[in-house]
Amino acid sequence: MATAKQNETFADTLATVLHQDAEHTVYRLGGTDGEVVQTVFPVFPGIEIVYHDVHATACAMQRTRAPGCLEIHHCREGRIAYPYGDACFFLSPGDLAIVRRSAAAAPARFPTGHYHGITVSIDPARAPDCL
């Protein structure tokens, strides 16, 4: 059963938990002009993998991160534009971006209204020392 709740891991976005178990959580994000689903897999403390399935033109899908977090983004299909400071980076199929977050980002844009990709997030303050 899906439950709607304000989830503090998503900046200013109403997230509906579609499924949750010991291995992953599936969210549907609100506040969009279409459908945005994120599947989140915690790997280790401070490290997670997020699959993005987007059929919308914009969404505040940025998960709240501590300053200094490292994100590795890969676009499998579609296109995404992420604001970053005074600039913006665009990913097309096959593109990869490595970003160090200093603050929460503005909403992502999807010029084609379609995006499938993956993000690996690493919070060095919480990640195991062996990594």
Predicted regions and their residues:
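A short, N-terminal "cap"/entry segment at the start of jelly-roll beta-barrel domains
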Residues: 1-42
